[in-house]
């Protein structure tokens, strides 16, 4: 039987993780062993559990305890705290309307190294300073659907485990292997050392079309996407093996990074190419 705790006061310290700590505070870089994240909705929480994430506590609508949450709770220790209230009370507490009426505080998993997640990969995505959590989530969803084996991110970009990012990804951030690129060495050199060629998605005249057969024939290819607005840094483009552009019409010169990723992943991912 789950440890159901009806909410009687907003000031209970155990609710800080849901109501008063920012996501940056939850990351807790000074104490990574105790770092946390918040997963939202039964689907996302279920995929986090599938990925081996450890649940710490729940916050949910009272009606979901024996409804949508029942299967999720059956997978968790019986003594895990489950804080409950009606939806309007939860909205007052958190400041937003819960998707499917459920949040779960979970322990952040330890990240693997670039070499560990890329050794057997053939198609990976590199995200340079992509800042919007919604874009991060959409990119992960496309990566999962369209045959990308891993995602690498620069440290300045948005965290894939932010609540909005994991929700928009439909939980695929727990299915697609990912990690951060090292800041003390050239990540291009790291990827070249692992056998990857790099393809920068950039708005330049001296580019290959996305359908160029040389890209599809590469046994190991990293698709490199840049930040919203400015795109990739010039130095990044110059150090990549290819520069690639999506052909467009009607005078449109660019796509949102999440939309561009879907097009690129479809064309170059393992789903489309027998590489």
Explain the meaning of each model-derived region.
Residues 1-71, 157-158:
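Boundary-proximal intrinsically disordered activation/regulatory segments immediately upstream
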Residues 7, 37, 128-129, 154-155, ...:
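Glycine- and other small-residue-rich loops at beta-strand/loop junctions that grip anionic moieties
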Residues 199-252:
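Active-site/ligand-binding-proximal alpha/beta "capping" segment
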């Amino acid at each position: 039987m789950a440890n159901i705790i009806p909410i009687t006061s907003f000031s209970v310290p155990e609710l800080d993780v849901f109501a008063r700590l920012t996501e940056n505070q939850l990351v807790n870089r000074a104490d990574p062993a105790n770092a946390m994240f918040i997963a939202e909705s039964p689907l996302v929480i279920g995929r986090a559990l599938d990925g081996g994430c450890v649940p710490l506590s729940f916050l949910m609508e009272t009606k979901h305890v024996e409804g949508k949450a029942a299967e999720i709770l059956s997978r968790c220790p019986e003594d895990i705290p489950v804080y409950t209230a009606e939806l309007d009370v939860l909205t007052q507490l958190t400041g937003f309307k819960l998707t499917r009426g459920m949040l779960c505080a979970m322990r952040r998993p330890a990240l693997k190294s670039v070499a560990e997640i890329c050794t057997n990969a053939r198609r990976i995505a590199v995200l340079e300073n992509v800042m919007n959590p919604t874009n991060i989530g959409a990119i992960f969803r496309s990566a999962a659907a369209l045959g990308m084996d891993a995602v690498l991110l620069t440290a300045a970009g948005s965290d894939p485990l932010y609540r909005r990012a994991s929700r928009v990804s439909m939980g695929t951030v727990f299915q697609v292997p990912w990690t951060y690129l090292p800041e003390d060495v050239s990540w291009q050199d790291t990827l070249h050392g692992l056998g990857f060629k790099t393809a920068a998605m950039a708005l330049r005249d001296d580019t290959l079309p996305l359908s160029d057969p040389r890209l599809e024939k590469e046994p190991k290819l990293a698709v490199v996407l840049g930040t919203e607005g400015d795109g990739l840094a010039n130095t990044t483009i110059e150090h990549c093996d290819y520069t690639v552009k999506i052909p467009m019409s009607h005078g449109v010169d660019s796509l949102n990074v999440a939309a561009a990723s879907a097009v690129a992943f479809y064309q170059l991912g393992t789903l489309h190419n027998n590489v």
